[in-house]
């Protein structure tokens, strides 16, 4: 099953945390849709900034939105004007008090979502899919990735029949739950139709902290 399931979802609660941290009773559906709306709005508005992840925390009538961005300068704007405008728009959308936090993505080459979006953009610019995949894999491995797999699916190179091609380097142990594997998906809208891009990046193992045995008095 490791081959089929989303590696992020499989590892939630084991080595990965939730991206939406809140509890709800009867208004769960309402808040979930609000989360989806906020994420879609932020991703669309900050397309140039490279936003792989938006974390949302809620407490009473307050919402904390943490935006992970490869180019935080674009999100913040000159003198913080852009981030302030964004906060006001989110407050108008949710009707709640919103705090916006910007987190910089230090190595965009090791973020699967950003890598997938980068490959999709190259495909839209008519770059050969093999070249796009190969160069991206090399860049990720140079930045310290332990393994990467990229899969492109659709009418590759304008072929009549759709197919799936993939390229990988290093190792990507999908069944190992302690393996820190990032997964990203993006779509390239080409003149021949959509091409789906999936990326798996293995960053190493996350080992649990050793428990120190407590010694009781005199023993």
Swiss-Prot record:
SMART domains: KH. InterPro entries: KH_dom, KH_dom-like_a/b, KH_dom_type_2, KH_sf_prok-type, Ribosomal_S3_C_sf, Ribosomal_uS3_bac-typ, Ribosomal_uS3_C, Ribosomal_uS3_CS. Keywords: Ribonucleoprotein, Ribosomal protein, RNA-binding, rRNA-binding. Pfam families: KH_2, Ribosomal_S3_C. One of its GO terms (biological process) is translation. GO terms for cellular component: cytosolic small ribosomal subunit. SUPFAM superfamilies: Prokaryotic type KH domain (KH-domain type II) (SSF54814), Ribosomal protein S3 C-terminal domain (SSF54821). One of its GO terms (molecular function) is rRNA binding. Residues 38-106 form the KH type-2 domain. It comes from the Bacteria. Binds the lower part of the 30S subunit head. Binds mRNA in the 70S ribosome, positioning it for translation. Belongs to the universal ribosomal protein uS3 family. Part of the 30S ribosomal subunit. Forms a tight complex with proteins S10 and S14. PANTHER family: 30S/40S RIBOSOMAL PROTEIN S3 (PTHR11760), SMALL RIBOSOMAL SUBUNIT PROTEIN US3C (PTHR11760:SF19). This is Small ribosomal subunit protein uS3. It comes from Desulfitobacterium hafniense (strain Y51). The gene is rpsC.
């Amino acid at each position: 099953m490791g081959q089929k399931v989303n590696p992020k979802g499989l590892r939630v609660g084991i080595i990965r945390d939730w991206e939406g941290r809140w509890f709800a009773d009867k208004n769960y559906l309402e808040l979930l849709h609000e989360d989806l709306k906020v994420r879609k709005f932020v991703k669309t508005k900050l397309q140039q900034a490279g936003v792989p992840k938006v974390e949302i925390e809620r407490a009473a009538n307050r919402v904390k939105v943490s935006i992970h961005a490869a180019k935080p300068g674009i999100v913040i704007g000159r003198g913080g004007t852009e981030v302030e405008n964004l906060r006001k728009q989110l407050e108008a959308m949710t009707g709640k008090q919103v705090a916006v936090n910007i987190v910089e993505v230090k190595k965009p080459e090791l973020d699967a979502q950003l890598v997938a979006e980068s490959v999709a953009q190259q495909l839209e610019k008519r770059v050969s899919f093999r070249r796009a995949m190969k160069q991206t894999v090399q860049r990720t491995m140079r930045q310290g990735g332990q393994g990467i797999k990229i899969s492109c699916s659709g009418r590759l190179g304008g072929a009549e029949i759709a197919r799936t091609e993939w390229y990988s380097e290093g190792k990507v142990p999908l069944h190992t739950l302690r393996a820190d594997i990032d997964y990203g998906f993006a779509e390239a809208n080409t003149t021949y139709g959509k091409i789906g891009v999936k990326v798996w990046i293995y960053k190493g193992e996350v080992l649990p902290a050793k428990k120190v045995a407590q010694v009781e008095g005199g023993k």
